[in-house]
């Protein structure tokens, strides 16, 4: 636990460039809420093969907030990927879902880099999203 807190603290220090701490934390909280909203929209839409689109969209919206949003998107995406990979390894075998993880990571990086998340939009997804 101490190691995890140390890593989070170090990435936080490195993530703050010249902006004030207040704006960085505000952006981080808003970015986390963007990811949360994208997750719930994905669950609400319930459209097959839409996960990459919503991952890209959540990371895109978080990155638009600024450095704090990018930081939050990276941390949340990496922790989620780590936990998912850990559970896959324990319950389903070593390489189960590896292709999905790689394509999800690519979609998240695509969104964080500011590119259009509609690149991953599946056919049949309502315009509401």
From Swiss-Prot:
Which residues are the signal sequence here? Answer: 1-18
In the record, biological process GO terms are: acute-phase response
* SMART domains the record matches: SAA (SM00197)
The keyword Protein biosynthesis belongs to this UniProt entry's keyword annotation: no
| Compartment list | Secreted
Which segments show compositional bias classed as Basic and acidic residues? Answer: 107-121
Listed A to Z, the keywords are:
Acute phase, HDL, Secreted, Signal
Where do the record's region annotations for Disordered lie?
A: 107-129
Q: Which InterPro entries match?
A: Serum_amyloid_A, Synovial_Prolif_Regulator
Q: Does the keyword Signal apply?
A: yes
Can you tell which superkingdom this protein's organism belongs to?
Answer: Eukaryota
Q: Name one GO cellular component term.
A: high-density lipoprotein particle
- Sum up the protein's function in the record's words: Major acute phase reactant.
Quaternary structure (record): Apolipoprotein of the HDL complex.
Regarding protein family, the annotation reads: Belongs to the SAA family.
Q: This chain belongs to which protein, by name?
A: Serum amyloid A-4 protein
State the organism of origin. Answer: Bos taurus
Q: Which gene encodes it?
A: SAA4
């Amino acid at each position: 636990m101490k190691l995890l807190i140390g890593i989070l603290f170090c990435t936080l220090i490195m993530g703050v460039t010249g902006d004030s701490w207040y704006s960085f934390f505000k952006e981080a909280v808003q970015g986390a809420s963007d990811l949360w909203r994208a997750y719930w929209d994905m669950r609400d839409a319930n459209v097959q093969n839409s996960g990459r689109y919503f991952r890209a969209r959540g990371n895109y919206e978080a990155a638009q907030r600024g450095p704090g949003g990018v930081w939050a998107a990276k941390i949340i995406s990496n922790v989620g990927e780590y936990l998912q990979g850990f559970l896959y390894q324990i319950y389903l075998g070593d390489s189960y879902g590896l292709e999905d993880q790689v394509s999800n990571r690519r979609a998240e990086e695509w969104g964080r880099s500011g590119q259009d998340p509609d690149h991953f939009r599946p056919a049949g997804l309502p315009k509401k999203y």
